[in-house]
UniProtKB/Swiss-Prot annotation:
<keyword id="KW-0150">Chloroplast</keyword>
<keyword id="KW-0604">Photosystem II</keyword>
<keyword id="KW-0934">Plastid</keyword>
<keyword id="KW-0249">Electron transport</keyword>
<dbReference type="GO" id="GO:0019898">
    <property type="term" value="C:extrinsic component of membrane"/>
</dbReference>
<keyword id="KW-0793">Thylakoid</keyword>
<protein>
    <recommendedName>
        <fullName>Photosystem II extrinsic protein U, chloroplastic</fullName>
    </recommendedName>
</protein>
<feature type="transit peptide" description="Thylakoid">
    <location>
        <begin position="37"/>
        <end position="61"/>
    </location>
</feature>
<keyword id="KW-0813">Transport</keyword>
<keyword id="KW-0809">Transit peptide</keyword>
<feature type="transit peptide" description="Chloroplast">
    <location>
        <begin position="1"/>
        <end position="36"/>
    </location>
</feature>
<dbReference type="InterPro" id="IPR006311">
    <property type="entry name" value="TAT_signal"/>
</dbReference>
<comment type="subunit">
    <text>PSII is composed of 1 copy each of membrane proteins PsbA, PsbB, PsbC, PsbD, PsbE, PsbF, PsbH, PsbI, PsbJ, PsbK, PsbL, PsbM, PsbT, PsbY, PsbZ, Psb30/Ycf12, at least 3 peripheral proteins of the oxygen-evolving complex and a large number of cofactors. It forms dimeric complexes. The extrinsic subunits in red algae are PsbO (OEC33), PsbQ', cytochrome c-550 and PsbU.</text>
</comment>
<comment type="similarity">
    <text>Belongs to the PsbU family.</text>
</comment>
<dbReference type="GO" id="GO:0009535">
    <property type="term" value="C:chloroplast thylakoid membrane"/>
</dbReference>
<dbReference type="GO" id="GO:0015979">
    <property type="term" value="P:photosynthesis"/>
</dbReference>
<dbReference type="Pfam" id="PF06514">
    <property type="entry name" value="PsbU"/>
</dbReference>
């Protein structure tokens, strides 16, 4: 009696033979196989089809956003879509006033920033100093949701 180890556990076999030829070792037994060849191949085919159908799809992100220059890389900042870190280039705004600006949006015009009840008088003075450097473009979901924390850390 022999024990043959398979993926499904050990199988008891009355007799087993092992022979060698040019292609390698071959093992034979007198018992029925635990898994038929047809079941094994159809399972492998099903797994391959499932893997092909579940492959990753490309992101449908918009890469040609017309306001990209106003997100912090230029001289002007879009108050509706720019991240809070974009205000670092304006002394006195980052982080406190910038956070209040970002959380108070969206704005119709840059002047609407001054209507934010969270701003102190000092914040408003500093904002007025840079008012000509702000634009208010329509909020876009791709950037509006990441204004406070866009996940980029330096």
């Amino acid at each position: 009696m022999a024990f043959i180890s398979t993926p499904l556990g050990k199988v008891t076999v009355k007799s087993a033979t092992v022979s060698a030829n040019r292609r390698g070792l071959r093992m034979q037994s007198d018992s029925e196989p635990v898994v038929s060849r047809r079941a094994l191949l159809s399972g492998a085919l099903a797994a391959a089809v499932a893997a092909a159908l579940a492959r990753a799809r490309p992101a449908q992100a918009r890469i040609d956003y017309e306001g990209i220059g106003y997100l912090g890389g230029g001289d002007k900042i879009d108050v509706n879509n720019a991240n809070v870190r974009a205000y670092r280039k304006f002394p006195g705004l980052y982080p406190t006033a910038a956070k209040k600006i970002v959380q108070g949006g969206p704005y119709g015009t840059p002047d609407d920033i001054l209507k934010n009840p969270e701003l102190s008088e000092r914040d408003k003075e500093v904002i007025k100093k840079y008012m000509d450097r702000f634009v208010a473009l329509p909020p876009t979901p791709e950037y509006f949701t990441d204004r406070v924390n866009n996940g980029i850390y330096k």
